[in-house]
Amino acid sequence: MGGCISKTSWSNEEPMHRPCLGMGCCGSKMGKRGFSDRMVSLHNLVSIPNRIIGNGKSRSSCIFTQQGRKGINQDAMIVWEDFMSKDVTFCGVFDGHGPHGHLVARKVRDSLPVKLLSLLNSIKSKQNGPIGTRASKSDSLEAEKEESTEEDKLNFLWEEAFLKSFNAMDKELRSHPNLECFCSGCTAVTIIKQGSNLYMGNIGDSRAILGSKDSNDSMIAVQLTVDLKPDLPREAERIKQCKGRVFALQDEPEVSRVWLPFDNAPGLAMARAFGDFCLKDYGVISIPEFSHRVLTDRDQFIVLASDGVWDVLSNEEVVEVVASATSRASAARLVVDSAVREWKLKYPTSKMDDCAVVCLFLDGRMDSETSDNEEQCFSSATNAVESDESQGAEPCLQRNVTVRSLSTDQENNSYGKVIAEADNAEKEKTREGEQNWSGLEGVTRVNSLVQLPRFPGEEPKT
């Protein structure tokens, strides 16, 4: 993946197989209709059970997002349980940037999981036999080899599905008639939990971590994904080979950015992203970093979050917050609340970034009982769009867990009325926020984009 891959050889055609979504669609009378005809619809997605995209909780997870002080909340998130069978869960966090970043993030949130399912079944159909079949237990060496081979096969299938679905997603964004992605894009950190197997696909600087216990039952933080930023040597080398430029501005020397060869724009603060087609010929790619991990009984939970969290909280601090939460249903919100406090303490003159958090508990259980106050803040119903919860008093956070770090080597055509209403609501909240921060003359600490590019022959805007 070291070359410039703005043009790929993958087919433009999307497979039309019918994956089982845990909805009884397999074997239905709709067999002759394409999968995308039945599923890639916002209204149909809303009706899918065990899929949440707004602040709330599910059987084994909780998710929460809060708008920052930069404008419309450009973060999106999803948890989809019973994704293809009872033991499969899909989770994702998508951080948008640029003028239409919020729309890109939501489009990817809605479309990428469907593409992943469709392509997985397309690949599986060529392999013969159902995914997830395991060799029967046996003490013989042959049985162990068969199971190992099956694990490798499953790993290969998921990797190919991740690679092809990310590629198909980026192609759809490029050709989308109503979604301008030339200077807008989004990150994606996505995971599939299938039994004890964890499959991860990541682009950009959103991150996934694992909260686990060591031999002394102390909590440790394991980073599962690499922040794919331009300062990584392999990323910088690819970008430079494609004539893109990588450097940091004088007033933020710690933030390396990607620039066009002929203009000091757009200054993208990540090396891989969906969209951002102004840079796709100059080394920015949408190929995910794929990884696989076998979970153990010591592994407790997984946290996915946008960089608005990681800019101010360490992996250990996030694990500490989740592990010490008195209610699992409130864990994601507690992480966001902690990040908000840290933004105010560390960068009082900066505009806080959007924050989005997904917490997936690996034992599959949430709280047995939930207080009335929590029920008001967290809805288990499936939501069409994310909404900002009304903020009450900040919860008291009792930290009684010591956490160590364990490092790893793995570095549509229409959105319709629903999206329009969401945008109007968010814009109203943005205006209110701007009034509250009207006296702030500080700078935004880290913008994903510095400015929009000007191309030869284009008149400068005055």
UniProtKB/Swiss-Prot annotation:
Species this protein is from: Arabidopsis thaliana
InterPro entries according to UniProt: PP2C, PPM-type-like_dom_sf, PPM-type_phosphatase-like_dom
Keyword Kinase set for record: no
Catalyses which reaction(s): O-phospho-L-seryl-[protein] + H2O = L-seryl-[protein] + phosphate; O-phospho-L-threonyl-[protein] + H2O = L-threonyl-[protein] + phosphate
GO molecular function: metal ion binding; protein serine/threonine phosphatase activity
Chain residues that bind Mn(2+) 1: D95, G96
Alphabetized UniProt keyword annotations: Hydrolase, Magnesium, Manganese, Metal-binding, Protein phosphatase
The protein's Enzyme Commission number: 3.1.3.16
Chain residues that bind Mn(2+) 2: D95, D307, D353
Name this polypeptide is given: Probable protein phosphatase 2C 1
Pfam families, sorted: PP2C
Region of interest (Disordered), ranges: 369-394, 421-443
Family under the similarity heading: Belongs to the PP2C family.
Role this protein plays: May act as negative regulator of GCN5.
